Every structure is written in structure tokens, then in C-alpha cells.
Amino acid sequence: MAGDLKPPAPRPTHLAEAVRFAWPYLARYRRGFALGMAALLMKDLLAAALPVVIRLGVDSLGAGFQLATLLGFAGLLVALSAVKGLFQYAMRLVLIGISRDVEFDMRNDLFARLVTLSGSFIARYRTGDIMARATNDLNAVRMMIGPGVMYFAETSITLVLAVAVMLTVDWRLTLIALTPAPLVSLAVIFFGGRIHDRFERIQAQFSDISSRVQETLSGMRVLRAYLQEQPELAHFEALNRDYVARNIALAKLSAVFYPVLQALIGLSFLLVLWAGGTRLLEGRISLGTFVMFNTYMGMLIW
């Protein structure tokens, strides 16, 4: 039973470690995952095409208003948006569904492993640590595999496609729009590590609370025999106050991070309005191009 005495594996501290841990489970659904990513790619391609259609429509109307032309571009936009919505639905259905399946498999494997462990393992290591891994930790893994991977891929592909189109139309205006990008990267690096650390502290505190609840329930008769209900209640309240404080600390940091990020991205929008408006008045770009750039900036902000 020597193998039973190994402590619970430490939580992954980096995204790469978390991906390596989850990959054997994710590989079971690689075909579905590939299908979901294909739907994501198609959705992003259609989304990137919409501003181009808007640009063509605005420029064509600038040459002379024709109802048939307006209706044609409007119908094309509606059709592209509808197909994009279908791909987006398929993307979420498949990728989020796979994350639920992976979570289900992990829970089953964890439980199957736990029932084979010896009593010495249970005696040596806190039950709360195991409970935390079976609840909060697995939920976090599911969020990383599902929404985490999906939103990361979606944002990355949208950024590449939008910048590629913008560069082909007006590379100077694109460079101006991307001026705040290094500041955005620095903000993500600065806040990202701190948010991760505070999230880890929350997970650790949840483990402490789970252990305390299990120990209290197991020793309830002893607590009552020695009249320790009030001290135990006070200790449990202290643990919960600490848990709340750690969550508030994370919320405060997030409350600073997201406005800073939005402000930096909004600066890009402002630069496009200023530089693009100037180039429009000087006749260097068309009205459709100006509208297209602003549409792409709106996509990147959201």
C-alpha cells in the first residue's frame, strides 16, 4: 500500500500544466473537439466578412443611392449573420458539451480511485482536500476546457483575421490602431499572474472549509460532550470570513483589471476615429473603409 500514501497531486499552477493534465481526457473526444473548432473557425470567418460587406455597401451607396443595391447588401448581411449564428450555436453546443463530458469522466475516475485507497490514506490526508478536488477543482478544469479554450481560440482567430484585412486595406491606419497593443499585453501579464494567485488562495481556503466541515460532522458527539459547539462555530465563521475576504480581494483586482483593459482597447478605438477621420476628410480613404475599421475595432473590443 505504499502507493496509497502519496499525497494528492498538487494543483496545476500554469495553463500548460493544466492542459497536459486534461489532454488524455480531451483526446477521447478529439473528433468532436475538431468539429467544434471547425465551427468556431467558420463562425469567425463569417464574422470577419461582415465588415467587408458593410464597406462595399457604404461605398456603393456613396456612388449613388439605389434601392436594389441597398436591399441586396442588407440581404447579404442578414444571410451571413444567420449562417454565423448557426455555426456559433454548433460551436458552443459541441465545445461546452465536451467540457461537460470530460468533467463527468474525471469525476468517475476520481471516485473509482478513491474507493480503492486504503484507510491509511484517509487517515493521513485531509478529506477536505479530496472534496475540493472533486468539486471546485473539477469545475475549474471544465471551465478551462470549455469556455476557456473556446473564448481564447475565438479571440485569437478574430484578432488575426481582423488585423489581416485591415492591413490589406490601409496598413498605416492599422498600425495606428494597434499602438496600444503592447500596453494591453503588459496589463494582461501584470494582472493575470496576480488574479491566478488569488484564485489559488480561494481554492485552498475552500479546501480548508471542506476539511473543517467533515471533521466537525465526524466528531459532533465529542464536540457536544465537551461543550465545544460555540468555539467550533466561531472557528468556522472565521474560516468563512477569510474565504469571503479572499473572494473580495479577487473581485477588487478584477474590478481594476477589466476597466484598465477596456480603457486601453478604447484608446485604439479613439485613435481610429481620430486618424481615420482625418484620412477620410483628406480623401485618403473612403467612407466605407472608415466604417469598416470602426466595425472591426468594435469586434475586437467585445
Regions found by a protein language model. Name each.
Residues 119, 124, 154, 161, ...:
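Short, conserved catalytic or interaction motifs in soluble domains
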Residues 7, 11-15, 38-39, 46-59, ...:
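Juxtamembrane helix-loop junctions of ABC transporter transmembrane domains
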Residues 28, 32-42, 150-202, 272-285:
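Transmembrane helices of ABC transporter permease
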Residues 20-23, 31-52, 56, 73, ...:
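Alpha-helical segments in transporter systems
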Residues 119-120, 136-145, 149, 153, ...:
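An intracellular "coupling" helix at the cytosolic face of ABC transporter transmembrane type-1 domains
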Residues 27, 33-87, 94, 167-172, ...:
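Transmembrane helix-loop-helix hairpins at lipid-water interfaces of multipass membrane proteins
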Residues 77-84, 88, 181-189, 254-268, ...:
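Hydrophobic alpha-helical segments in the permease module
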Residues 12, 16-23, 27, 131, ...:
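Membrane-interacting alpha-helical segments
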